[in-house]
Amino acid sequence: MLISNTYNQHFPQLTQEQLARNATKKVICGMSGGVDSSVSAFILQQQGYQVEGLFMKNWEEDDDTDYCTAAADLADAQAVCDKLGIKLHKINFAAEYWDNVFEHFLTEYKAGRTPNPDILCNKEIKFKAFLEYAAEDLGADYIATGHYVRRAGDNENAKLLRGLDANKDQSYFLYTLSHKQVGQSLFPVGEIEKPIVRAIAEDLGLITAKKKDSTGICFIGERKFKDFLARYLPAQPGNIRTVDDEIIGRHDGLMYHTLGQRKGLGIGGLKNAGDEAWYVVDKDVENNELIVAQGHDHPRLFSKGLIASQLHWVDREPIRESLRCTVKTRYRQQDIPCVIEPIDDETIRVIFDEPQSAVTPGQSAVFYLGEVCLGGGIIAERI
Protein backbone atom coordinates (compact mmCIF):
# COMPACT_ATOMS: atom_id res chain seq x y z
CA MET A 1 0.00 0.00 0.00
CA LEU A 2 1.43 3.37 -1.04
CA ILE A 3 1.63 5.96 1.75
CA SER A 4 1.83 9.76 1.57
CA ASN A 5 2.40 11.71 4.76
CA THR A 6 1.41 14.87 2.89
CA TYR A 7 -1.96 13.32 2.07
CA ASN A 8 -2.47 12.30 5.71
CA GLN A 9 -1.75 15.87 6.86
CA HIS A 10 -4.25 17.49 4.49
CA PHE A 11 -7.16 15.06 4.25
CA PRO A 12 -9.41 13.94 7.11
CA GLN A 13 -9.41 10.26 7.99
CA LEU A 14 -12.68 8.70 6.86
CA THR A 15 -14.76 6.54 9.18
CA GLN A 16 -15.17 2.82 8.48
CA GLU A 17 -18.76 3.56 7.53
CA GLN A 18 -17.69 6.18 4.96
CA LEU A 19 -15.02 3.87 3.53
CA ALA A 20 -17.51 1.01 3.28
CA ARG A 21 -20.01 3.24 1.49
CA ASN A 22 -17.37 4.48 -0.96
CA ALA A 23 -16.21 0.90 -1.57
CA THR A 24 -19.53 0.21 -3.31
CA LYS A 25 -18.90 3.02 -5.82
CA LYS A 26 -16.87 2.68 -9.02
CA VAL A 27 -15.01 5.79 -10.19
CA ILE A 28 -13.40 6.16 -13.61
CA CYS A 29 -10.65 8.77 -13.30
CA GLY A 30 -9.57 10.58 -16.45
CA MET A 31 -5.79 10.07 -16.67
CA SER A 32 -4.01 12.67 -18.79
CA GLY A 33 -0.46 11.69 -17.94
CA GLY A 34 -0.14 14.79 -15.74
CA VAL A 35 0.37 15.21 -12.01
CA ASP A 36 -3.16 16.43 -11.19
CA SER A 37 -4.96 13.36 -12.54
CA SER A 38 -2.27 11.07 -11.09
CA VAL A 39 -2.80 12.40 -7.58
CA SER A 40 -6.59 12.46 -8.08
CA ALA A 41 -6.56 8.69 -8.64
CA PHE A 42 -4.50 8.16 -5.47
CA ILE A 43 -6.81 10.35 -3.36
CA LEU A 44 -9.84 8.37 -4.56
CA GLN A 45 -8.09 5.13 -3.63
CA GLN A 46 -7.39 6.48 -0.14
CA GLN A 47 -11.07 7.36 0.17
CA GLY A 48 -12.04 3.75 -0.48
CA TYR A 49 -13.49 3.97 -3.99
CA GLN A 50 -13.09 1.30 -6.67
CA VAL A 51 -10.81 3.26 -9.01
CA GLU A 52 -9.94 2.66 -12.65
CA GLY A 53 -8.26 5.07 -15.08
CA LEU A 54 -9.20 6.16 -18.59
CA PHE A 55 -6.83 7.76 -21.09
CA MET A 56 -8.56 9.77 -23.82
CA LYS A 57 -6.95 10.45 -27.17
CA ASN A 58 -8.70 13.50 -28.59
CA TRP A 59 -6.42 14.49 -31.45
CA GLU A 60 -4.84 12.55 -34.33
CA GLU A 61 -1.41 14.09 -34.74
CA ASP A 62 0.25 14.19 -38.16
CA ASP A 63 3.05 11.72 -38.81
CA ASP A 64 5.44 14.56 -39.60
CA THR A 65 4.86 16.53 -36.41
CA ASP A 66 6.11 15.92 -32.92
CA TYR A 67 3.99 18.56 -31.20
CA CYS A 68 1.36 16.23 -29.81
CA THR A 69 2.65 14.42 -26.76
CA ALA A 70 -0.08 11.74 -26.70
CA ALA A 71 2.32 8.77 -26.80
CA ALA A 72 4.48 10.12 -23.96
CA ASP A 73 1.40 11.10 -21.94
CA LEU A 74 -0.10 7.62 -22.37
CA ALA A 75 3.17 6.04 -21.19
CA ASP A 76 3.16 8.28 -18.10
CA ALA A 77 -0.51 7.53 -17.39
CA GLN A 78 0.18 3.80 -17.69
CA ALA A 79 3.21 4.04 -15.37
CA VAL A 80 1.13 5.85 -12.74
CA CYS A 81 -1.72 3.32 -12.97
CA ASP A 82 0.77 0.45 -12.68
CA LYS A 83 2.27 2.06 -9.57
CA LEU A 84 -1.18 2.59 -8.03
CA GLY A 85 -2.26 -0.91 -9.04
CA ILE A 86 -5.28 0.19 -11.08
CA LYS A 87 -6.50 -0.70 -14.56
CA LEU A 88 -6.09 1.84 -17.37
CA HIS A 89 -8.70 1.91 -20.14
CA LYS A 90 -8.00 3.71 -23.42
CA ILE A 91 -10.49 5.41 -25.74
CA ASN A 92 -10.16 7.46 -28.92
CA PHE A 93 -12.50 10.46 -29.08
CA ALA A 94 -10.66 12.15 -31.98
CA ALA A 95 -13.69 11.97 -34.33
CA GLU A 96 -16.00 13.49 -31.70
CA TYR A 97 -13.40 16.16 -30.95
CA TRP A 98 -13.04 17.12 -34.60
CA ASP A 99 -16.81 17.32 -35.18
CA ASN A 100 -17.86 19.00 -31.93
CA VAL A 101 -14.86 21.10 -30.91
CA PHE A 102 -12.35 21.74 -33.67
CA GLU A 103 -14.75 22.60 -36.51
CA HIS A 104 -16.52 25.09 -34.23
CA PHE A 105 -13.12 26.56 -33.30
CA LEU A 106 -12.30 27.15 -37.00
CA THR A 107 -15.75 28.60 -37.74
CA GLU A 108 -15.40 31.13 -34.92
CA TYR A 109 -11.91 32.20 -35.97
CA LYS A 110 -13.08 32.60 -39.56
CA ALA A 111 -15.80 34.96 -38.27
CA GLY A 112 -13.22 37.12 -36.50
CA ARG A 113 -14.08 35.92 -32.99
CA THR A 114 -11.73 34.37 -30.44
CA PRO A 115 -13.16 31.10 -29.09
CA ASN A 116 -11.93 29.02 -26.16
CA PRO A 117 -11.75 25.38 -27.33
CA ASP A 118 -10.86 24.08 -23.85
CA ILE A 119 -14.31 25.10 -22.60
CA LEU A 120 -15.95 23.32 -25.53
CA CYS A 121 -13.75 20.25 -24.96
CA ASN A 122 -14.98 20.01 -21.37
CA LYS A 123 -18.58 20.40 -22.54
CA GLU A 124 -18.51 17.96 -25.47
CA ILE A 125 -15.76 15.48 -24.60
CA LYS A 126 -14.75 15.25 -20.93
CA PHE A 127 -18.17 15.71 -19.37
CA LYS A 128 -20.27 14.28 -22.20
CA ALA A 129 -18.51 11.62 -24.33
CA PHE A 130 -16.28 10.50 -21.42
CA LEU A 131 -19.08 10.63 -18.85
CA GLU A 132 -21.43 8.61 -21.07
CA TYR A 133 -18.74 6.04 -21.96
CA ALA A 134 -17.70 5.63 -18.31
CA ALA A 135 -21.30 5.17 -17.12
CA GLU A 136 -22.64 3.03 -19.96
CA ASP A 137 -19.62 0.94 -21.01
CA LEU A 138 -17.52 0.79 -17.84
CA GLY A 139 -20.29 0.82 -15.21
CA ALA A 140 -19.07 3.94 -13.40
CA ASP A 141 -21.02 5.56 -10.60
CA TYR A 142 -18.83 8.67 -10.96
CA ILE A 143 -16.13 10.07 -13.17
CA ALA A 144 -13.23 12.05 -11.73
CA THR A 145 -10.84 14.58 -13.26
CA GLY A 146 -7.84 16.58 -12.10
CA HIS A 147 -9.63 19.92 -12.42
CA TYR A 148 -9.16 22.52 -9.67
CA VAL A 149 -12.83 22.96 -8.77
CA ARG A 150 -15.02 21.76 -5.92
CA ARG A 151 -18.47 20.28 -5.70
CA ALA A 152 -21.07 20.95 -3.02
CA GLY A 153 -24.20 18.83 -2.65
CA ASP A 154 -25.39 15.84 -4.65
CA ASN A 155 -27.56 15.13 -7.67
CA GLU A 156 -30.17 17.86 -8.27
CA ASN A 157 -28.61 20.07 -5.58
CA ALA A 158 -25.01 19.83 -6.82
CA LYS A 159 -23.21 23.16 -7.09
CA LEU A 160 -19.92 23.96 -8.80
CA LEU A 161 -17.47 25.86 -6.57
CA ARG A 162 -14.14 27.50 -7.27
CA GLY A 163 -11.05 25.41 -6.52
CA LEU A 164 -9.46 26.02 -3.13
CA ASP A 165 -6.24 27.15 -4.85
CA ALA A 166 -7.19 30.56 -6.27
CA ASN A 167 -4.14 30.52 -8.56
CA LYS A 168 -5.27 27.27 -10.18
CA ASP A 169 -9.08 27.54 -10.02
CA GLN A 170 -10.52 26.12 -13.27
CA SER A 171 -14.23 26.79 -12.77
CA TYR A 172 -14.03 29.27 -15.67
CA PHE A 173 -13.52 26.30 -18.02
CA LEU A 174 -16.37 24.22 -16.54
CA TYR A 175 -19.26 26.69 -16.49
CA THR A 176 -21.21 24.76 -19.15
CA LEU A 177 -21.72 21.78 -16.82
CA SER A 178 -25.20 21.10 -15.47
CA HIS A 179 -25.88 20.31 -11.82
CA LYS A 180 -26.48 16.71 -12.97
CA GLN A 181 -23.01 16.48 -14.58
CA VAL A 182 -21.41 18.10 -11.53
CA GLY A 183 -23.24 15.59 -9.32
CA GLN A 184 -21.77 12.69 -11.32
CA SER A 185 -18.22 14.04 -11.06
CA LEU A 186 -15.52 14.07 -8.38
CA PHE A 187 -12.72 16.64 -8.25
CA PRO A 188 -10.21 15.36 -5.67
CA VAL A 189 -7.47 18.00 -6.10
CA GLY A 190 -9.96 20.88 -5.98
CA GLU A 191 -9.78 20.67 -2.19
CA ILE A 192 -6.01 21.34 -1.99
CA GLU A 193 -3.35 23.65 -3.38
CA LYS A 194 -1.03 22.77 -6.25
CA PRO A 195 2.19 22.53 -4.19
CA ILE A 196 0.47 19.91 -2.00
CA VAL A 197 -0.50 17.93 -5.12
CA ARG A 198 3.13 17.84 -6.21
CA ALA A 199 4.26 16.93 -2.68
CA ILE A 200 1.88 13.94 -2.62
CA ALA A 201 3.21 12.82 -6.02
CA GLU A 202 6.78 13.15 -4.67
CA ASP A 203 5.88 11.08 -1.59
CA LEU A 204 4.59 8.33 -3.87
CA GLY A 205 7.51 8.49 -6.30
CA LEU A 206 5.18 9.07 -9.25
CA ILE A 207 6.79 9.68 -12.63
CA THR A 208 4.57 12.76 -13.05
CA ALA A 209 5.67 14.47 -9.82
CA LYS A 210 7.91 17.03 -11.55
CA LYS A 211 6.20 17.02 -14.95
CA LYS A 212 5.41 20.56 -16.03
CA ASP A 213 1.80 21.58 -16.50
CA SER A 214 0.52 21.51 -20.07
CA THR A 215 -0.06 24.98 -21.51
CA GLY A 216 -2.03 26.33 -24.41
CA ILE A 217 -4.70 24.68 -26.49
CA CYS A 218 -4.44 20.90 -26.33
CA PHE A 219 -4.31 20.25 -30.09
CA ILE A 220 -1.73 22.96 -30.75
CA GLY A 221 0.63 22.12 -27.91
CA GLU A 222 3.82 24.15 -27.89
CA ARG A 223 3.87 24.93 -31.61
CA LYS A 224 3.35 28.44 -32.96
CA PHE A 225 -0.34 29.28 -33.05
CA LYS A 226 -0.03 31.25 -36.30
CA ASP A 227 1.65 28.37 -38.13
CA PHE A 228 -0.98 25.94 -36.91
CA LEU A 229 -3.98 28.09 -37.90
CA ALA A 230 -2.52 28.71 -41.36
CA ARG A 231 -2.76 24.98 -42.11
CA TYR A 232 -6.55 25.06 -41.76
CA LEU A 233 -7.61 28.63 -42.56
CA PRO A 234 -6.13 30.61 -45.46
CA ALA A 235 -4.99 33.98 -44.15
CA GLN A 236 -6.59 37.11 -45.59
CA PRO A 237 -4.25 40.10 -45.23
CA GLY A 238 -5.82 43.54 -44.91
CA ASN A 239 -5.32 47.10 -43.74
CA ILE A 240 -4.55 48.33 -40.25
CA ARG A 241 -6.62 51.47 -39.70
CA THR A 242 -6.46 53.90 -36.79
CA VAL A 243 -9.51 55.13 -34.89
CA ASP A 244 -8.85 58.44 -36.71
CA ASP A 245 -9.45 56.63 -40.03
CA GLU A 246 -5.83 56.58 -41.21
CA ILE A 247 -4.32 53.45 -42.79
CA ILE A 248 -0.93 52.87 -41.17
CA GLY A 249 -0.04 49.29 -42.04
CA ARG A 250 -1.09 45.79 -43.06
CA HIS A 251 -2.10 42.74 -41.04
CA ASP A 252 -1.60 39.07 -41.98
CA GLY A 253 -5.14 38.07 -41.06
CA LEU A 254 -7.71 39.20 -38.47
CA MET A 255 -7.71 35.75 -36.89
CA TYR A 256 -4.13 36.24 -35.69
CA HIS A 257 -5.06 39.24 -33.54
CA THR A 258 -7.03 39.75 -30.34
CA LEU A 259 -8.51 42.83 -28.68
CA GLY A 260 -6.03 44.56 -26.41
CA GLN A 261 -3.05 43.11 -28.29
CA ARG A 262 0.02 45.32 -28.31
CA LYS A 263 2.91 43.22 -29.63
CA GLY A 264 3.38 41.92 -33.14
CA LEU A 265 1.49 44.64 -35.00
CA GLY A 266 4.54 45.87 -36.92
CA ILE A 267 3.52 49.53 -36.81
CA GLY A 268 6.14 51.15 -34.59
CA GLY A 269 8.19 54.20 -35.52
CA LEU A 270 5.53 56.13 -37.43
CA LYS A 271 6.12 59.81 -38.14
CA ASN A 272 4.24 62.22 -35.87
CA ALA A 273 2.73 59.30 -33.95
CA GLY A 274 4.51 59.80 -30.64
CA ASP A 275 5.98 57.07 -28.48
CA GLU A 276 2.84 55.49 -27.05
CA ALA A 277 2.24 51.85 -28.01
CA TRP A 278 -0.51 50.83 -30.43
CA TYR A 279 -3.29 48.50 -29.30
CA VAL A 280 -5.94 46.52 -31.17
CA VAL A 281 -9.30 48.05 -30.21
CA ASP A 282 -11.61 46.40 -32.75
CA LYS A 283 -11.89 44.13 -35.79
CA ASP A 284 -13.88 45.27 -38.82
CA VAL A 285 -14.70 41.82 -40.21
CA GLU A 286 -16.81 43.17 -43.07
CA ASN A 287 -13.90 45.22 -44.47
CA ASN A 288 -11.18 42.89 -43.14
CA GLU A 289 -9.54 45.74 -41.24
CA LEU A 290 -7.79 45.81 -37.88
CA ILE A 291 -8.65 48.93 -35.88
CA VAL A 292 -5.92 50.30 -33.61
CA ALA A 293 -5.43 53.16 -31.17
CA GLN A 294 -2.52 54.53 -29.15
CA GLY A 295 -2.20 54.25 -25.39
CA HIS A 296 -3.15 51.55 -22.90
CA ASP A 297 -5.92 53.78 -21.54
CA HIS A 298 -7.55 54.73 -24.85
CA PRO A 299 -11.36 54.85 -24.41
CA ARG A 300 -11.94 52.45 -27.33
CA LEU A 301 -10.14 49.71 -25.38
CA PHE A 302 -12.76 49.83 -22.64
CA SER A 303 -16.31 48.51 -22.36
CA LYS A 304 -18.96 49.37 -19.79
CA GLY A 305 -20.54 45.96 -20.25
CA LEU A 306 -21.37 43.18 -22.68
CA ILE A 307 -24.15 41.17 -24.27
CA ALA A 308 -23.84 37.40 -23.75
CA SER A 309 -25.72 34.58 -25.47
CA GLN A 310 -25.54 30.74 -25.64
CA LEU A 311 -26.12 30.74 -21.90
CA HIS A 312 -25.46 27.79 -19.60
CA TRP A 313 -26.52 27.98 -15.96
CA VAL A 314 -25.31 25.17 -13.69
CA ASP A 315 -28.78 24.81 -12.13
CA ARG A 316 -30.29 25.06 -15.65
CA GLU A 317 -32.75 27.75 -14.50
CA PRO A 318 -32.76 30.90 -16.70
CA ILE A 319 -32.21 34.19 -14.90
CA ARG A 320 -35.48 36.13 -15.02
CA GLU A 321 -34.63 39.23 -12.96
CA SER A 322 -31.64 41.47 -12.36
CA LEU A 323 -28.84 39.86 -10.38
CA ARG A 324 -25.82 41.45 -8.72
CA CYS A 325 -22.80 39.13 -8.89
CA THR A 326 -19.26 39.06 -10.29
CA VAL A 327 -17.97 38.04 -13.72
CA LYS A 328 -14.73 36.93 -15.36
CA THR A 329 -14.36 37.69 -19.08
CA ARG A 330 -11.13 35.69 -19.34
CA TYR A 331 -9.26 33.07 -17.33
CA ARG A 332 -7.24 34.19 -14.28
CA GLN A 333 -8.91 37.60 -14.30
CA GLN A 334 -9.87 39.31 -11.06
CA ASP A 335 -13.61 39.11 -10.44
CA ILE A 336 -15.47 42.12 -11.87
CA PRO A 337 -18.51 43.31 -9.87
CA CYS A 338 -21.49 43.58 -12.20
CA VAL A 339 -25.24 43.40 -12.65
CA ILE A 340 -26.89 40.87 -14.99
CA GLU A 341 -30.03 42.12 -16.74
CA PRO A 342 -31.96 39.40 -18.61
CA ILE A 343 -33.03 40.29 -22.16
CA ASP A 344 -34.66 36.89 -22.75
CA ASP A 345 -33.93 33.27 -21.74
CA GLU A 346 -31.06 33.08 -24.24
CA THR A 347 -29.49 36.53 -23.89
CA ILE A 348 -28.35 38.80 -21.05
CA ARG A 349 -26.96 42.30 -20.71
CA VAL A 350 -24.10 42.65 -18.23
CA ILE A 351 -23.15 46.06 -16.82
CA PHE A 352 -19.80 46.39 -15.03
CA ASP A 353 -19.34 48.60 -11.98
CA GLU A 354 -16.19 49.99 -13.68
CA PRO A 355 -15.28 49.95 -17.41
CA GLN A 356 -13.11 46.96 -18.41
CA SER A 357 -10.48 46.60 -21.11
CA ALA A 358 -10.20 43.99 -23.86
CA VAL A 359 -13.64 42.39 -23.53
CA THR A 360 -13.46 39.96 -26.45
CA PRO A 361 -16.40 38.61 -28.50
CA GLY A 362 -16.24 34.82 -28.77
CA GLN A 363 -14.71 34.42 -25.33
CA SER A 364 -16.75 33.33 -22.32
CA ALA A 365 -18.21 35.47 -19.55
CA VAL A 366 -18.50 33.37 -16.38
CA PHE A 367 -20.53 34.46 -13.36
CA TYR A 368 -20.05 33.90 -9.63
CA LEU A 369 -21.83 34.44 -6.35
CA GLY A 370 -19.04 34.15 -3.82
CA GLU A 371 -17.49 30.70 -4.21
CA VAL A 372 -20.30 29.37 -6.40
CA CYS A 373 -19.95 29.32 -10.19
CA LEU A 374 -23.41 30.17 -11.52
CA GLY A 375 -22.67 29.51 -15.19
CA GLY A 376 -21.98 31.78 -18.12
CA GLY A 377 -22.26 32.46 -21.82
CA ILE A 378 -20.42 33.57 -24.94
CA ILE A 379 -19.65 37.28 -25.32
CA ALA A 380 -21.66 38.34 -28.38
CA GLU A 381 -20.78 42.04 -28.28
CA ARG A 382 -19.25 44.77 -26.17
CA ILE A 383 -21.28 47.67 -24.83
From Swiss-Prot:
Chain intervals for the UniProt region annotation (Interaction with tRNA): 168-170, 330-331
An example Gene Ontology molecular-function term: ATP binding
HAMAP family: tRNA_thiouridyl_MnmA
Organism: Haemophilus influenzae (strain 86-028NP)
Residues the record marks as site: Interaction with tRNA: 147, 363
Catalytic residues as annotated in Swiss-Prot or TrEMBL: 121 (nucleophile), 218 (cysteine persulfide intermediate)
Coarse class of the protein's main subcellular location: cytoplasm
Positions annotated to bind ATP: 30-37, 56, 146
The protein's name in its UniProt record: tRNA-specific 2-thiouridylase MnmA
NCBIfam families recorded: PRK00143.1, trmU
